[in-house]
Amino acid sequence: MIRNQGWSLLYRIYPVRRFTRYSRVDMTFEGNTQDISTSVEERMTTVFGGRLKGEPPRSTSRVLSGGTKKIAGVQVPAKPQEPDNCCMSGCVNCVWEIYSEDLRDWKHRRKEAAEKIAGTKEKWPKDWNPPLGLLHMENVPVELREKKLETDSKKAEQPHDLSAIRSLFPKRKGPLPKSVLAAKRKNIALRHNYEQKDGGDQSVSESDADEGWEDIPVYVKAFAEFESKKRLQKIRRQEEIKKRTALV
């Protein structure tokens, strides 16, 4: 009696979780293993698809690209397709980074072909994304000459200097901080080295920099370019380490 009262008092001060036995319950889990009319690949596209505008699935493999065309002696590839299979899991070889590299190579080859076709009577194929801003009128297909005039007029209207933008901000009363000046000098030196070592992307004019990224969120473009630059920096550091070890 006294022992039972002691236990009851102890349970009031320090509550104890009690376990109750239940009868066994049978549970059945049903998956999608029955009555499946689609293939494994088609079901994978519904899970790993990442299309930006809800288009139907399409292949974006680099192996199944649109081929190349020889223009003014330069093999110009087809315009890269936007990837639709990003899994958003931080892959080492991200499809957006690969797309950025393909787009950079495509712009570089297209600009090289536009420079070599100048002064000739050869016409750029109208179905091969002609760079109207880089071509002379005699090299533009007849069907696209009106569009070429519109492109040139828009380019002429754009200011070539930053005077219009600078006028929006008040003039600085004092000099820039030393840290800012040092950072500017460092960025200029890095940009100069990048143009010398990897001039492919820098050869593209700023007016064509956004080509291929029009319908893609800007944060995706920034992510792809950032990852590409970090990877190139890592490769350069590894090459410098190899050179130093070889000299030792």
From Swiss-Prot:
The entry's cellular-component GO terms read:
mitochondrion
**What keywords are annotated for this sequence in UniProt?**
Mitochondrion, Transit peptide
Pfam families according to UniProt: Oxidored-like (PF09791)
Q: Write out the annotated subcellular location.
A: Mitochondrion
Which segment is the transit peptide? 1-26
Ranges for the Oxidoreductase-like domain?
69-116
| Principal location class | mitochondrion
What does the further note read? Present with 2100 molecules/cell in log phase SD medium.
* Family of this protein: Belongs to the UPF0651 family.
Query: What's this protein's name?
Result: UPF0651 protein YPL107W, mitochondrial
